[in-house]
Amino acid sequence: PNYGEQKTSGLHYSGAFENGQAAMCNMGSWFLATMQKYNAEASANGVQPVNFGIVKYPHPDGAPAGSTLGTVTSLAINANSTKKEAAADFLNWCASEEAAEALAATGNFPAVSSDKTSEIIASTDGFPNDENSKEALKTTAVYLEMPLSDKASEIETILNTEHDAIMTESETVDEGIANMNEQVQAILG
């Protein structure tokens, strides 16, 4: 299906990828665990598993090969908590190598990464067997997908709206970029 049909039918991109309607899916690291689960449950669900692999993210000129995108997922302690010390202990554990290895064992990518966590991820059930997929785990730099800003949510709404307009051919790429720039600048002042 084209983008408009996919959007109006409610077909999620993971479904389009899983059923072969999309040849590739530009997704975050979390999608690996999604695909591993899909394949593990495929037989019981009466569908075929997907033979897939992963590759390194394309990088712009000037960025080292192996560069990728990342985002911030925050953990916090409620100021009104009666268990602040226990919460702080948990947060410290979350940032530890032990926690990174535990998360990697589930096929997910921890915030603290190392050669060891990459080896663990590559050894999880359902990880693609090809060398390119293993090589894709080796990154050289991680850049924020979106700069930290209290306006990030408003800006993302603009980006998504203009993306939809471009993908449904309601406007050209140049028009969409111009609209994004104008609307984002209005928010940033």
What are these regions (language model features)?
Residues 52-56, 105-161, 165:
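Long, aromatic- and glycine/proline-rich binding clefts that accommodate carbohydrate-like moieties
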Residues 1, 21, 35-42, 94-98, ...:
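Sec/Tat-exported extracytoplasmic proteins
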Residues 8, 14-19, 58-61, 77, ...:
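A residue-level marker of the well-folded mature domains of exported/periplasmic proteins
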Residues 1-41, 85, 176:
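Extracytoplasmic ligand-binding clamshell segments of periplasmic binding protein
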Residues 63-70, 80-87, 148-156, 170-173, ...:
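Solvent-exposed, acidic/flexible segments
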